[in-house]
Amino acid sequence: MDRSDTAVALGSDRDQRLREAVARARRSDFYRRHLDGFVLTGRADLHRLPLTFKHHLREATPFGMLAVPPHRAWHYHETSGTTGEPISTWCGLSELRSMAAVVHRLVPELSEDTILLNRFPLFAPVSFVFEEALRLAGACHIAAGTMSWDVPFDRAVDFIRRLGVTAIASLPLEPILLHDLAVDQGLDPRQTFASVRVVFCGGAVLPPALRRAIEHDWQARVVEIYGSNETMLMGVGCPRGRLHLCSDLLETEVLDPQTHQPVAAGAAGVMTVTSLVHEVMPLVRYYTGDLVRIAPEPCGCGHAGPVADVLGRIDDVIEIGAGRATHADVLDAAYTFADRLGTRIFFMLIRPRTLHLLVEVEHPESVADPIAERRLAEQIGLPVVVEYLGHNEVLDRSALYRGPKIYKPSVVSDWRGSARKTITIMEALLEWPKYDWRTVLHLARRQVRNARRRSRIVKEDKKV
C-alpha cells in the first residue's frame, strides 16, 4: 500500500469512528433532539452538525446528556459552578482507561517506581485519569487534593519530603506556593524536592515563563495536562514542552468566536471537540470556550498529535481601550517581570483603564524600574500600573498553616482523659487553630491594610 492508499485508509477509519461516536451520542435525550434530521457521513460534513454549548449541558443536567443508564457510569462529577449552576458530567471506565493509556504512553516518568502526589481536586475527573495511569504503570498514587482540609499545603510539603514523591500533579500555581512554603519553613527546596522528576500542571493556562519558573525551582520536567470536566482529557505535553492534542480520543476543530467557522492555519480560535471514545456522556461539536492556537508545523518529538497553545478562556480576554490580551499573555509577561525582580509572588487586578500588578519584593522602596515597567506594558499590549509590596503582603504564608484539623464525625466525647473535650458535633468534627494575641494583631493589621488598599483603588476607579 503506498502513502496515498494509507491516507485513504486512515481517513476512512477516522470517518467510521466519527459516525459511531455520533451514533452513540444520539442515545442521549439531548442529542436525540439536537441532532434530529442531521446526517453525518464523515469528517467532511461534521461542520453541518449544530454546535453544543455549555448552556445546553447546564439545561440537560443531570441526566439529559447520558447515553447509557446512570448505573452504567463509572464516575459522576460536577463542575464547580463558578460561572453558573454546576454541570453534571459522567464518565465510563473504558474511556477513563483510554485516557490513562495516553498519559502512560506519553510520559516516561510514569514508571513502576513512581510515587505521585495528586493535588488536583478529588471531584475532578483528571484525578481518576492519573489513578488509572498509575495503575497501568504499577505505581503509587497519593490522593491528596488541594481543596481537602486534611492535606493542607504544609502537609503536602511533608509528604514530598518524607515519602520520596517522584511526581506531583496540580494546578500551575501550586508548585510556586509549595516551593515558597518550603523556603518559609527553613527548608532547602533543592533537597526537599530532590526526588521529584516530573510536575504535571493542568486546570489553568501554563504560559512559558511560568513553566520555566517551575522547572527552575523544582529541577524537574513540567508536563502540561489539558482538559475539562466536560471533555476530560484533551491534551498531554511532550518531552519538548509542547502540548499535543489527543487526536486518538477526540475530533477537534478550531472555530472563529464570531462566525463559528474554521480559523486560518495558525490563527487563534475556540477549541471545539467531538468525542471518539466516550460512551457514557459523548459530546458532538462541543464549543469549549477555550481559546487555542494550533501550530502549523509538526513537533520535533515525533508524536503525530496536533500541537496547541492554550491561551485561556475566550470570555476572559481582556480589552482596555484599543488593546486586547489573553490571560496567557498577561501571565507570561507578569512572571517574566517578577522573575527579573527575584520573586514569584504577585497578584494582577484588571481595572477599567489599566492592569494593576501587585508584586511582592524584599525591598519595595528601592526596586521601581520605569523602563522594565514600560516593557511589561508593551509585552502585554495594555497599560499597566505596578505597585511594589513587602514580604507577606501579597501571599500571607501563615494562612497556609491555619486550616482546621478534620476528625471523624462523632456524637460522643470522652471527658475523662486528656483527649479533646468537645460539646457539639461541629467541635468534634473540626478543630480550628487557637491564635495568640500576636497572630490576632497580625491578622487585624493585614485586614486594615487590605481594606485601605481596596478603598483607594475603588476611589481611583470612580474618578475615571
Question: What are these model-predicted stretches?
Answer:
Residues H55-S195, V205-A213, D217, G241, ...:
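Active-site phosphate/ATP/adenylate-binding loop shared across adenylate-forming ligases
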Residues R161-L171, D217-R221, R242-E251, P404-W415:
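A polyampholytic, Gly/Pro-enriched intrinsically disordered region
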Residues M1-R105, R162, T354-L358, P364-V464:
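Nucleotide 5′-phosphate-binding alpha/beta core
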Residues R197, L206, L210-P298:
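Conserved AMP-binding/adenylate-forming
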Residues A144, I225-G227, L255, E387-H391:
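Conserved beta-strand termini and adjacent loop/short-helix elements that scaffold enzyme active sites
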Residues C140, R221, E251, P383-V385:
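Conserved beta-strand segments of alpha/beta enzyme cores
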Residues I168, T272-L382, Y407:
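AMP-binding/adenylate-forming catalytic core of the ANL superfamily
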